[in-house]
Amino acid sequence: MELVITGSNNKVSVSEAVFGREFSEDLVHQVVVAYRNAGRAGTKAQKTRSEVAGTTKKSKKQKGGGARHGALTAPIFVGGGVTFAAKPRSFEQKVNRKMYRAAICAIFSELNRQGRLMIVDAFDLEATKTKDLIEKLKGLDVGKRPLIVTEEASEHLYLSARNLPYVQVRDVQGLDPVALVGADTVVITADAVKKVEEWLA
């Protein structure tokens, strides 16, 4: 299949397996959730009644008309332990390489179908100027949250986009499903398209 390069009459031939794949919502959801879970610290820690510092001596006598109480480390007391205390754990989920790549292909294909994938000849700046980047993006009409994908990392481009909170810049090696799904428009260079195909084909 062929896709038009924005701003010219040229076309680029792309693999249908990468940019024309059927969209699987379940697959993409599973991979996105797994990717986000892998970024969780999982360091939350609370103490149970047996771990809280304090005496376990009975706090008051059994009889006398009041409620029956034992140790002050019980969960019902302030400063006592937590009933179902959270412990550090890993939230990581196993995702096969084949599944991950299939999900990336499905996302690219859906972006293409929805007209949210924009291919350009090149995307670079001569100097580190945020103003220049803003003007360039306005000319492309990419929406509020664009993702710019280049073949290799560009220092001028990265630094210019750094203080634009909704603009993301990635090279092909740094692509991930969350960035692709969250973008209004993905602006990708023709060279980056070829590199994506090499990675996913």
UniProtKB/Swiss-Prot annotation:
Region listing for Disordered, in residue ranges: 44-68
Gene Ontology cellular component list: ribonucleoprotein complex; ribosome
Quaternary structure note: Part of the 50S ribosomal subunit.
Highest taxon listed in the record's lineage: Bacteria
Entry's family note: Belongs to the universal ribosomal protein uL4 family.
Lineage: Bacteria, Pseudomonadati, Pseudomonadota, Gammaproteobacteria, Lysobacterales
Alphabetical list of PANTHER family matching this protein: 50S RIBOSOMAL PROTEIN L4, LARGE RIBOSOMAL SUBUNIT PROTEIN UL4M
Gene Ontology BP annotations: translation
Pfam families named among the record's database cross-references: Ribosomal_L4
Descriptive protein name: Large ribosomal subunit protein uL4
MF term (GO), any: rRNA binding
InterPro entries according to UniProt: Ribosomal_uL4, Ribosomal_uL4-like, Ribosomal_uL4_dom_sf
Organism of this sequence: Xanthomonas oryzae pv. oryzae (strain PXO99A)
